[in-house]
Design a protein with these regions (language model features):
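Histidine-centered active-site microenvironments of extracellular/periplasmic hydrolases
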Residues: 318-326, 415-418, 422-468, 494-524
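Phosphate/adenylate-binding glycine loop and adjacent helical scaffold
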Residues: 489, 493-666
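Beta-strand-enriched, solvent-exposed domains that form extended recognition/catalytic surfaces
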Residues: 46-206
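N-terminal signal-anchor transmembrane helix specifying type II single-pass membrane topology
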Residues: 1-47
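A long, amphipathic alpha-helix that forms part
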Residues: 16-20, 25, 42-45, 73, ...
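Substrate-binding rim/cap in mid-to-C-terminal beta-strand-loop elements of soluble/periplasmic
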Residues: 256-273, 386, 437-492
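Active-site-proximal alpha/beta segments of enzymes that process anionic O-linked groups
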Residues: 192-203, 208-394, 487
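Exposed low-complexity, polar/acidic, P/S/T/G-rich flexible segments that act as propeptides
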Residues: 176-211, 618-623, 628-629, 642, ...
């Protein structure tokens, strides 16, 4: 009897434990749901929770060492699901293109009319005109890099042989009969003869002779984070995995926008250093920048650079651009002609279609054309697209299949056997609703980066390939990419200076230190994803003092902008609210005796509603240190800053009467 009672009691106890366990699981689920669906708790608080509870574990991190705790975040985190959607592809024209540029087997280049497409029309007549930029450099014209002119339109019927014609861009116009224009399009012409003689002369005298040089092809999509690339371009991700490309999972940007991040890649310099030699705010100083493509050209490489959206391109957005073409094949005149001389269609606040073609297609078709033209000869190509991704987090989803098709075409043409191919971005989305979440903060700082090395290079350089495999899970930065380009250049017999922006950075063909932090990689704490956050009391006087000092800092900067009568162009701003403040844990610089307190603010100012993230140092007693490179605006200023054509536009809310008088002219 006692045994039966004992068993019965044990059974009841077991059931009680099961019920308690079930109740506990329900409580945990409810807490987790609340945790993720409450605005504040769903992002920074969650991050704070992880950094505290996984303090001594590498589980859940992309990079983990004593200096860097870089979280692995779910691309479909609940806090951002509402912002994610798939965009549909829409062709720019339902009709086939009437004309194409064709490279014949013997190398001859033809402008050709598609005879099948031409059958749609009874009396088709076409002519072509050469498009060119000014041939004489003139420093007094501040828009040299945005000027184009068209030559006379020359009639043709079936084709034009372009071999002996010095033309890089042309405009085709076709009519059905004598009056009605039924087709207009622009074409870029990559004629190897333009660079061939120079390349032959260089090759015969350089140390590259008898060496197999590795070509370089860089393909960029603006404003695409690593996580967003996985969300929007799964077919491309699958292609990269299938073909054996290497993804740098710990690639962290070093600056705010496109310009500093690409300058770090192309010159190895930070903004402060590059401004000493080539301040882009001054006319044509970019011509004196030590872009690494010049070093590749000097050692015998053909060079090319192209970027769509001429008004916001890297070297022309509130900048004068280049007085002289910086590369052998400089496609800005082609993009200008496409945007100015053809009908355009807007999408994502960009010129999505120019004539019958997608703007992004023009860039990557040019990349294919250039790299294919120089298969077997060393080349350096830099091709960048803004049109589908600069203003839209979801825009790349419409291009996924087409992008894979471009990559396969390059592979079929032999480009992948010749070239180190890098597919990358500069940063994630810098504006929009997603930036109010922690995941948005995180994604902005971690752009995607994939790299391909030909089989022959892997065989000849097993240590370089092994190092690259190691580096895919370590902290890397744009300065490491510059050092990698410098490494490729040196292997071809060329030289370039080491990175001044990050003297400790090294080529990706060498293993980076396992114990590496953002300071080692040339990344400031403001942009660093190796950091952690802790709660901080908003009511602490230190917080309000810091916010007030930031407002004063902003107003002092904008005070310099005045009308001819001495009136302020920008409104005096004040603090609207402290949205968030956290204590920033910089694991690269944590010392028990350090009295410096790092605070990470999200502030909203008024008028205008500008939202700013600031990483601010506080040193007792009462010293708040604000650095310009530690401030970022996370919502668009748009026409709010229309009274300024350059300078600190992100801080300027134009005074209403001044802004209205300017807008009347648009």
């Amino acid at each position: 009897m006692w045994i039966v009672w004992k068993l019965s009691k044990g059974l009841r106890l077991s059931r009680m434990l099961q019920s308690f366990t079930l109740l506990l699981m329900l409580c945990v689920f409810a807490f987790t749901y609340f945790y993720y669906t409450t605005d504040e708790r769903s992002d920074y608080q969650h991050y704070q929770y992880l950094t505290r509870n996984l303090h001594n574990s590498s589980v859940g991190y992309l990079v983990w060492n004593s200096k860097c705790h870089m979280l692995s975040v779910n691309p479909y985190d609940p806090s951002i699901r509402q912002f994610v959607k798939k965009e549909t592809f829409e062709p720019c024209s339902t009709k086939p293109k009437l004309t194409t540029i064709n490279r014949q087997a013997n190398g001859s280049i033809h402008l050709t009319v598609d005879q099948d497409a031409a059958k749609r029309y009874v009396k088709l007549s076409c002519c072509w005109a050469a498009i060119s930029r000014p041939t004489t450099a003139n420093e007094f014209f501040l828009d040299m890099d945005s000027r184009i002119s068209a030559g006379p339109c020359q009639d043709f019927k079936d084709r034009v042989v372009l071999d002996k014609k010095d033309v890089q861009v042309l405009l085709v116009t076709c009519r059905d009969g004598k009056a009605k224009v039924i087709y207009k399009n622009t074409h870029s012409v990559i004629n190897p003869k333009r660079a061939r003689q120079r390349l032959l002369n260089k090759s015969s005298s350089s140390s590259m002779k008898n060496k197999k040089a590795l070509s370089v092809l860089m393909l960029g999509l603006d404003s695409v984070s690593r996580l967003n690339f996985h969300r929007t371009m799964p077919a491309a991700c699958a292609y990269f995995a299938e073909r054996g490309w290497i993804e740098l999972r710990g690639y962290n940007k070093m600056g705010d926008n496109t310009f500093p991040n690409l300058m770090a890649i192309l010159t190895g310099q930070n903004e402060t250093t590059s401004n000493l030699r080539c301040d882009a705010k001054l006319p044509y100083t970019l011509d004196h920048c030590p872009m690494i493509w010049y070093n590749f050209r000097d050692v015998g490489y053909a060079t090319a650079y192209a970027e769509d959206q001429a008004g916001i391109s890297t070297f022309n957005n509130v900048k004068a651009g280049f007085m002289k073409p910086p590369t052998d094949y400089y496609l800005r005149p082609y993009i200008l002609a496409s945007e100015k001389l053809l009908p355009t269609r807007q999408r994502f606040n960009c010129k999505h279609c120019t004539g019958p073609e997608l703007s992004v297609d023009r860039i990557f078709n040019a990349a294919l054309d250039f790299s294919e033209a120089f298969v077997g000869r060393p080349s350096f190509g830099f091709f960048w697209s803004n049109s589908i991704s600069h203003e839209s987090m979801n825009g790349p989803s419409l291009y996924d299949a087409r992008f894979v098709a471009k990559l396969r075409a390059m592979d079929d043409a032999g480009v992948m056997n010749d070239s180190m191919v890098v597919v990358l971005s500069d940063h994630g989305m810098r504006y929009g609703d997603i930036r109010d979440t922690f995941v948005g903060w995180y994604e902005e700082r971690l752009p995607f980066f994939y790299i391909w090395l030909p089989e022959w290079f892997r065989r000849r350089n097993p240590d370089a390939y092994a190092a690259l495999l190691v580096n895919q899970d370590r902290l890397t930065s744009p300065y490491d990419v510059y050092e990698t380009l410098r490494d490729v250049l040196q292997r071809a017999g060329g030289q370039a200076p080491i990175s001044t922006g990050c003297p400790l950075c090294s080529s990706l063909f060498k293993p980076t230190s396992m114990e590496r932090g953002c300071r080692d990689a040339g990344i400031s704490p403001h942009w660093c994803t190796c950091v952690g956050f802790e709660s901080y009391n908003k009511s602490d006087p230190i917080v309000s003092e810091g916010a007030s000092q930031f407002v004063e800092y902003v107003n002092n900067l904008t005070e310099r902008y005045k009308t001819s009568l001495g009136l302020r162009l920008c409104s005096i701003l004040s603090l609207k609210r402290i949205i968030r403040v956290k204590k920033l844990l910089d694991y690269d610089n944590l010392r028990p005796t350090d009295k410096v307190l790092k605070l990470f603010y999200l502030l909203e100012l008024t008028p205008g509603g500008g939202k700013f993230e600031i990483t601010m140092d506080y040193r007792p007693p009462g010293i708040h240190i604000i650095r310009e490179e530690q401030v970022s605006r996370i919502n668009l200023y748009g026409h709010d800053a229309i009274c300024l054509d350059k300078g600190y536009k992100k801080y300027c809310q134009c005074r209403i009467n001044i802004a209205h008088s300017i807008l009347k002219w648009f």
